[in-house]
Amino acid sequence: MAEEQRMQENFPVRLRFLFEPAEEIGEGAKRMLQAGALENPKADAFLMFHYAADMTFGMAVHQGQASSMINSMQIHVHGKSSHWCEADKGIDAIYAAAQVISAIHDLNESFGKQHPDAGKYIVGTGTIHGGEYTNIIADHVVLNGNIRAVHEETYTALEHELERNLQEIEKQTGTQIRMEFPKDPVYAFANDEELTETAKVVGAEVFGDKFVLEGEDELFLSGDNAYRYFRETRGLFTVFLAGIPGENHPLHHPKFQLDERILPYSVEALYKIITTL
C-alpha cells in the first residue's frame, strides 16, 4: 500500500484506463462515452495503441490521419424459386450474386483508374449465404462485406458506383437487389500534432531506428470506433510492431501471434508519452 501511495504521489498526471467492450461490432466507444468514460474529470488527452505482426520489433505513428473510413454492407439478391427441371420458371439468385461478386472485383480494379486521386480503398465480401437444396433454384442470397477508403469522398463515390452496378445487374438478371448498411459508418480520425511530436521523441528514445513515422501512403485500410473519442479530445494512436520472424500471419488469422518481447518496450514508451503530457 505504501509503495502504491508513493507512486500515486509521484505520477504527474491523472490516468484512466478504458477497457472497451463490443469494439469489434463498432459499439464499444459509443457505449463508453454514454457512460461518461471521458468525464469527471474531463480527459485532456486520449491515447490508444494496437499491436501488429506485419513487421518485427518497432513502433509506428501516423503523421495526421491515422485511420480510414469503413462500414459493413449487406446485399440481398432476390430471385424466384422453382425446380431445376423447370428452370425457365425460376430466377437464379445465385447466378445474380455471382455477378455481384464479379462487379465488386471489377470495381476495385477500375475505380482507381477513373479516379487517380482516390487514395487507398477496397470493397470486399466476407460471407455469402443462399439456397435451400441441390434441385431448387435459389430465390434469395445474402452477401455481407465492407467498404473501406482513406478519403470520405472516395468512400461515398464507391458506395454510389456500387449501387449503380447493382441496378445494372438487376436489369440483366431479372432479380431484385437491395444494398443495406445496418450501422453508421466508422469515420477516420487523426493524431494530434503535439502528441505526435511527443511520440516521435519517445519513439526514437525507446526504439531507436525502429521507430517509424508514417504518412498517408502507409495508411492501413482499417477503421476503429475509437474515432468517437478523438471527437471529444485530442488523441494519439500508436502501433507497436511485434511480428515473429518467419511467422507473418495477418490480422484475424487463427495463427496470429505476437513477439511478447515487445511488451516492456511498449509499456516504457506509453509511460514516457503519458508523463510528458
Language-model features and meaning:
Residues 1:
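DPxDG-like acidic metal-binding loop motif
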Residues 98-277:
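Metal-dependent amide/peptide-bond hydrolase catalytic core
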Residues 4-127, 132-136:
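Histidine/acidic-residue-rich, glycine-tolerant segments that coordinate divalent metal ions
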